Amino acid sequence: MNQIAARTTSTNVTQVDNYKKGELFEEYIIKLFNEQFFYLNKWRKSTPYADGQISGDLWNPDIEMELVFSGKKRYRFAVECKWRKEFTDGKIFWARDEQIVSYRIFQDQWRIPVFVAIGIGGAPDNPERLFLTPLNNIYMHNELYESDLIPYKRKPTSRFYYDFIQLKLF
């Protein structure tokens, strides 16, 4: 009986710990946006859910941003944040099929580009490596090889730049 209780408690602690790591990485990504030019529309913070239920809002990307120019049009986009401790056998599992489908539906419904920020190694609030890719480039795979992410590698401490002509986040 005690082993079952201990295992359940350990699982719950691990789940909360994983959500805390997710929240730290999301906060790290948000800080890479210059507040002078980017407005945080929505932050769907990583939070544990009760009884295995996920609210509908949590199926959408973690962050919605706007590039804002004084007196000009606003350019919206979203970012899904994923931090992983390391690559395993040269790859990571980044999302379940239903999550990826949900991100695609969000992108199509709202007609705004979705990007995926992937931090590897270090700590969630200070990853060793950072990759930033358009969802359109990876939505066919829930496992990503390190070699596939190389073109999207960026310096982890560099602020983001959004090219509203090409709809690309750098």
Name each region found by the language model.
Residues 1-7, 12-13, 17, 24, ...:
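Non-catalytic C-terminal interaction segments of nucleic acid-processing enzymes
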Residues 14-15, 50-54, 87-95:
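Short, flexible/disordered intra-domain loops and linkers
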Residues 21-29, 98-102:
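Conserved alpha-helical elements of sugar-nucleotide-dependent glycosyltransferases
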Residues 31-58, 62-66:
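A short acidic/basic microdomain associated with nuclease active sites
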Residues 33, 61-87:
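Conserved catalytic cores of phosphodiester-cleaving nucleases, focusing on short active-site segments
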Residues 44-47, 115-123:
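Acidic carboxylate-rich catalytic motifs and surrounding loops in phosphoryl-/glycosyl-chemistry enzymes
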Residues 78, 102, 115-118:
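Aromatic- and glycine-enriched beta-alpha-beta binding-site module
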Residues 84-107:
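Mg2+/Mn2+-dependent nuclease catalytic core
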